[in-house]
């Protein structure tokens, strides 16, 4: 048996079913091209019979993708298979994936048929699909709850009439790993022609076991795993592609299995799917979460600085990230601060370590996480724990035109002790406020992240806006709190403006320090 596990991605079919709004054809094509770069073997890109839009997107992707096999879903109905075949016919290589329910509850309650009738429908569907391609996959929907005798009969019959891949889905995420492994093992033991097909699994995450069940399945002989980027999908989601890929890579010595995934594309692909699908990745998500390679504990940070593998079983570089993160918090030791200053290009002769660390702890206790620009200010601006308020928002007035969608904002800002009033228009109230603030401060920054949340509950809740902005190729993080979301957004921007102003002062000080060095060396 081959040790190669086929990765079947269904982000654009099962994954899209979880979205509040459908992706455009252009967005689906972007994701498909990212999946091709990632190296998925098969990508299931839609359900052509379901709508003209889905048909068009499947056809567009099938025409474009060359290095992955493109697949479309169909029920065990000739009209579905016809639509799939027509949409896929422009592809260099394609697969038709047809399915029917096999569990007792589905057969009796949903299909209102006998199992023998369902078996006949499945056989007919596979035969019909084989008219269009040799690559036919058949799925036993709700296999996890199907009586094993019936499941064996269905699998044997589908293989006999030409299915080259047999998918065993845990459709409702019901099974546990030992149970699911037994199902796969029983199929290998009892289905006489099982060597003529690849056994696939498609596990849902209702009980949080989709990845564990999929890994157990390949340990028992399955050689295709169906999954999605970031685990998106119906209800609690699907098996996560990035987790499967990195488990098989990280534990190759124990599992003896491999994939064709280009792991260095994982982070990039995860971000793209998250942005286009408007589904943020939770911070503690395995592999691709913001905290996956972040260390805050002083003990862990100390170990990481001595040897990276003390607390990391894989490197951030392996998934396409530049480096891990050592969060600078009140739990960080002196060695972490010294290490970070060295990474920014400073030697111990440039600053007073004792004074810096003392001020660092004060600031960390106050604000939680300390950033590079905070550290530089503490080191070179004489214990400046309090942030400069060169800019202070005095008043914000916004007017919106509901018919045109254009808003006008007027701001009054104190700039270095001088009051300035400016007005600007924008595409909505937040955009207008930002344009007015930029005009008043004459400071241009690029906002790359905007997050809206709440602090507190009920009537006492405040809107909290967190933004990340780029200024002179450095990221700055601003926070704004207010009862009004637009005002909170404006305060977050002014916060960033003050941080960039302080950064300019630090840069001037560093330049002066460098000149003094040069003069001293003459």
UniProtKB/Swiss-Prot annotation:
Cofactor(s) for this UniProt protein: Mn(2+)
Record key words, sorted: Amino-acid biosynthesis, Branched-chain amino acid biosynthesis, Cytoplasm, Leucine biosynthesis, Manganese, Metal-binding, Transferase
Catalytic activity: 3-methyl-2-oxobutanoate + acetyl-CoA + H2O = (2S)-2-isopropylmalate + CoA + H(+)
Pathways involved: Amino-acid biosynthesis; L-leucine biosynthesis; L-leucine from 3-methyl-2-oxobutanoate: step 1/4
Single Gene Ontology BP annotation: L-leucine biosynthetic process
Cellular compartments annotated: Cytoplasm
Region (Regulatory domain): 392-522
Domain Pyruvate carboxyltransferase: 5-267
Pfam families registered for this protein in UniProt: HCS_D2, HMGL-like, LeuA_dimer
Enzyme class at the top of the EC tree: transferase
Residues binding Mn(2+): 14, 202, 204, 238
Record EC number: 2.3.3.13
One GO MF term attached to the UniProt entry: manganese ion binding
Primary location: cytoplasm
Example of a GO cellular component annotation carried by this entry: cytosol
Stated family: Belongs to the alpha-IPM synthase/homocitrate synthase family. LeuA type 1 subfamily.
Subunit structure: Homodimer.
NCBIfam families, per the entry: leuA_bact, PRK00915.1-1, PRK00915.1-3
Name this polypeptide is given: 2-isopropylmalate synthase
Source taxonomy: Bacteria, Pseudomonadati, Pseudomonadota, Gammaproteobacteria, Alteromonadales
């Amino acid at each position: 048996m081959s040790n190669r596990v086929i990765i079947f991605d269904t982000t654009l079919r099962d994954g899209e079913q979880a979205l509040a709004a459908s992706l455009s054809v252009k967005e689906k094509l972007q994701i498909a091209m990212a999946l091709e770069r990632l190296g998925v073997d098969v990508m299931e890109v839609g359900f052509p019979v379901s709508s003209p839009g889905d048909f068009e997107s499947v056809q567009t992707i099938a025409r474009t993708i060359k290095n992955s096999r493109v697949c479309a879903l169909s029920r065990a109905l000739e009209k579905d298979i016809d639509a799939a075949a027509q949409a896929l016919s422009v592809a260099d290589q394609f697969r038709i994936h047809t399915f029917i329910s096999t569990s007792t509850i589905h057969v009796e309650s949903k299909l209102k048929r006998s199992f023998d009738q369902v078996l006949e429908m499945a056989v007919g569907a596979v035969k019909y699909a084989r008219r269009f391609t040799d690559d036919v996959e058949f799925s036993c929907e709700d296999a996890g709850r199907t009586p094993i005798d019936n499941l064996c009969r269905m699998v044997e019959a589908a293989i006999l009439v030409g299915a080259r891949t047999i998918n065993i889905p845990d459709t409702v995420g019901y099974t546990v790993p030992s149970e699911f492994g037994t199902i796969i093992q029983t199929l290998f033991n009892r289905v006489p022609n099982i060597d003529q097909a690849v056994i696939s699994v498609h596990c849902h995450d209702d009980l949080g076991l989709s990845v564990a069940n999929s890994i157990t399945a390949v340990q028992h002989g399955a050689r295709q795993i169906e999954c999605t980027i970031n685990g998106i999908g119906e209800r609690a989601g699907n098996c996560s592609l990035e987790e499967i890929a990195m488990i098989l890579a990280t534990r190759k010595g124990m599992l003896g299995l491999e994939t064709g995934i280009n792991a260095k594309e994982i982070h990039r692909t995860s971000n793209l799917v998250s942005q286009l699908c408007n589904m943020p990745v939770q911070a503690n998500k395995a592999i691709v979460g913001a905290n996956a390679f972040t260390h805050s504990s002083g003990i862990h940070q100390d170990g990481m600085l001595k040897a990276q593998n003390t607390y990391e079983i894989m490197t951030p570089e392996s998934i396409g990230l530049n480096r891990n993160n050592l969060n600078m918090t009140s739990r960080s030791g002196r060695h972490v601060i010294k290490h970070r200053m060295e990474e920014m290009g400073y030697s111990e002769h440039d600053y007073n370590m004792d004074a810096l660390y003392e001020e660092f702890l004060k600031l960390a206790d106050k604000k939680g996480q300390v950033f590079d620009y905070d550290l530089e200010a503490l080191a070179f601006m004489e214990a400046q724990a309090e942030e400069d308020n060169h800019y202070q928002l005095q008043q914000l007035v916004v007017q919106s035109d509901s018919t045109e969608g254009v808003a006008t904002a007027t701001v009054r800002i104190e700039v270095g002790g001088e009051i300035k009033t400016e007005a600007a228009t924008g595409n909505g109230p937040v955009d207008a406020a930002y344009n007015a603030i930029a005009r008043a401060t004459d400071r241009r920054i690029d906002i790359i992240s905007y997050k809206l949340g709440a602090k507190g509950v009920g009537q006492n809740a405040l809107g909290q806006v967190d933004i990340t902005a780029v200024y002179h190729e450095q990221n700055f993080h601003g926070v704004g709190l207010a009862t009004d979301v637009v005002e909170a957004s404006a305060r977050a921007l002014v916060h960033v403006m003050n941080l960039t102003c302080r950064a300019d002062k630090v840069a001037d000080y560093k330049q002066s320090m460098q000149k003094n060095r040069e003069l001293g060396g003459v």
